[in-house]
């Protein structure tokens, strides 16, 4: 995780070292970004920690929505949530996207997997429309616990398929992938 923050710091610094306005970093995602299950999330969610590391020259926004899916036909599409609208209005100079884990739900991936890459690219494009100079970082999904109640139902295999789809998006868009867990 420290390596991730070092990469983020270097990329952020390279974007606008001379800028007088704060550099805006939009953290887009699900409950992991939001900080669900993290003790004292207002202090310990990763966007808050990132803000502390980057300092006063940056404004980090936490636009995580618990349960959000990347898939537009998923059970809780991120693009239909208020957090998405808020993230667009924020118009980040850097956009960190960490979505996909909730798409492993049996209501989502088996039915709409063919739309995942297109939906992901459309999400990126929507942020480019509000800030054409935005820089993107796409996060690999968090590891899936074998204690998860759906682990044996196919979720484990879908998780790997989604990881591969995320890598395809990153390659197609020329966007750097990051990993919170290496």
Predicted regions and their residues:
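Alpha-helical transmembrane segments and their juxtamembrane interfaces
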Residues: 12-13, 40, 145
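Generic structural marker for isolated residues within well-ordered, non-membrane alpha-helices
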Residues: 5, 47, 124
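A generic structural signal for short, solvent-exposed coil/turn residues
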Residues: 11, 52-54, 64, 128, ...
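Conserved SGNH/GDSL esterase-like catalytic core that processes O-acyl groups on lipids
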Residues: 22-27, 32-118
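Alpha-helical cap/lid subdomain in secreted, periplasmic
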Residues: 20, 78-182
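Bacterial Sec-dependent N-terminal signal peptides
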Residues: 1-20
């Amino acid at each position: 995780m420290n390596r991730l923050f070092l990469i983020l710091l270097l990329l952020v610094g390279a974007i606008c070292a001379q800028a007088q306005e704060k550099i805006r970093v939009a953290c887009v995602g699900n409950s992991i970004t939001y900080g669900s299950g993290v003790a004292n999330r207002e202090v310990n969610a990763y966007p808050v920690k990132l803000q502390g590391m980057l300092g006063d020259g940056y404004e980090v926004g936490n636009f995580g929505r618990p349960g959000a899916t990347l898939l537009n036909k998923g059970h809780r599409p991120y693009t239909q949530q208020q957090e998405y609208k808020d993230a667009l209005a924020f118009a980040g100079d850097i956009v960190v996207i960490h979505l996909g884990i909730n798409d492993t739900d049996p209501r989502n991936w088996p039915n709409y997997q063919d739309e995942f890459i297109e939906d992901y690219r459309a999400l990126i494009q929507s942020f480019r429309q509000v800030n054409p100079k935005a820089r993107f970082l796409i996060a690999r999904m968090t590891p899936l616990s074998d204690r998860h109640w759906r682990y044996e139902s196919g979720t484990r295999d879908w998780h790997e398929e989604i990881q591969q789809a995320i890598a395809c998006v990153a390659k197609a868009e020329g966007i750097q992938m990051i990993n919170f867990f290496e």
